[in-house]
C-alpha cells in the first residue's frame, strides 16, 4: 500500500510542469525514504533526476518499494485539476494497475478523486557517478532563465565559460553575437539574489540552448539554481525543492566539430 499526502500540492504541479515536455513516460520509484524519478529525454541527450524526501510529506506510507509507470503529460493534466492551495494525496494498492490522486481544498469542503492507469515502462536505472566539478555557479534562477531565453533569440548553442572574473554566457547566430557576463556578487541583502562562483580551474563548454530553456521551466520551484561544470562531463543544473529534495537536469556538452577540424 502506498499513500502520500502533500499539503503543498502546488509543488507537485510545478514539478510536473518542469519535466513533462522533456520526458514522455517515466517510472516514479517510491521507497521508505522518498519519492523519486530518473529518466532520459526521448533523444537520450538529457537526464532528469527528481527526489522528494519522505519527511517533506505530511503523511508518507510506503509498505514496500514500488515503481509506478506514468505518462507525464497525462499526469500533468490530472494535476491541473487541483487548485494551487489543494492538498494532494497519492494512493496505490499493492498489485494495482492504477494510481489515485485525491485533491482536497484547504477548507475540506471539496474533495476530488482522479484515477489514472499505470503503464509498464522498461527503463534502465542509470548510475550517476558522483563527480568533483571544476566550477560551481549559484545564481538567481530567474536570472539564469532570462539569460537562456535572451540568448536563444540569437543562437542555438551557448558557451558557458567560468573564470575567476565570473561566468560568461556567449552565443552566435546569423544576426550576430551576444555575451552576458555575471560576476560574483555576495554583498546583496538577500542570499537568494547572490551570485556565488566556486572554481578550481577554468572551464568552457558548449550546450544546446533548447535543452537549457526546457530546464528553466523548474524556475518556480526555487529562487536559486546551481550549475556544476567540468570538462567532458555533463553539466548539472539543480533546483532545490524547499526542505524536500531537488530536481537535477544533466546535459551532455556539444562537441564543436568545426573547431576540431581547424585545430592544427
UniProtKB/Swiss-Prot annotation:
Gene Ontology molecular function: DNA binding; DNA polymerase processivity factor activity
Pfam families membership: PCNA_C, PCNA_N
Residue ranges of the annotated DNA-binding region, renumbered to this chain: 61-80
UniProt-listed GO biological process terms: leading strand elongation; mismatch repair; regulation of DNA replication; translesion synthesis
Domain of life where this protein originates: Eukaryota
CDD domains, A to Z: PCNA
Name of this chain's protein: Proliferating cell nuclear antigen
Organism of origin: Nicotiana tabacum
Amino acid at each position: 500500500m502506498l499513500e502520500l499526502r502533500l499539503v503543498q500540492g502546488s509543488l507537485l504541479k510545478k514539478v510536473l510542469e518542469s519535466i513533462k515536455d522533456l520526458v514522455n513516460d517515466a517510472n516514479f520509484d517510491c521507497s521508505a525514504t522518498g519519492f523519486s524519478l530518473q529518466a532520459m529525454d526521448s533523444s537520450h541527450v538529457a537526464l532528469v533526476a527528481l527526489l522528494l524526501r519522505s519527511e517533506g510529506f505530511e503523511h508518507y506510507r510506503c509498505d514496500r518499494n514500488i515503481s509506478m509507470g506514468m505518462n507525464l503529460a497525462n499526469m500533468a493534466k490530472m494535476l491541473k485539476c487541483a487548485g494551487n492551495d489543494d492538498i494532494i494525496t497519492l494512493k496505490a494498492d499493492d498489485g494495482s494497475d492504477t494510481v489515485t490522486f485525491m485533491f482536497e481544498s484547504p477548507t475540506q469542503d471539496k474533495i476530488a478523486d482522479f484515477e489514472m492507469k499505470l503503464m509498464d515502462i522498461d527503463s534502465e536505472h542509470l548510475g550517476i557517478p558522483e563527480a568533483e566539478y571544476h566550477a560551481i555557479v549559484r545564481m538567481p534562477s530567474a536570472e539564469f532563465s532570462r539569460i537562456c531565453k535572451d540568448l536563444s533569440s540569437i543562437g542555438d548553442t551557448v558557451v558557458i565559460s567560468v573564470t575567476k572574473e565570473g561566468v560568461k554566457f556567449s552565443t552566435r547566430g546569423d544576426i550576430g553575437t551576444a555575451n552576458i557576463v555575471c560576476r560574483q556578487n555576495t554583498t546583496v541583502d538577500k542570499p537568494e539574489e547572490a551570485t556565488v562562483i566556486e572554481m578550481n580551474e577554468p572551464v568552457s563548454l558548449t550546450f544546446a540552448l533548447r535543452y537549457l530553456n526546457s530546464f528553466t521551466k523548474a524556475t518556480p520551484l526555487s529562487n536559486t539554481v546551481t550549475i556544476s561544470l567540468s570538462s567532458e562531463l555533463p553539466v548539472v543544473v539543480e533546483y532545490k525543492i524547499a526542505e524536500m529534495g531537488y530536481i537535477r537536469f544533466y546535459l551532455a556538452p556539444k562537441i564543436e566539430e568545426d573547431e576540431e577540424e581547424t585545430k592544427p
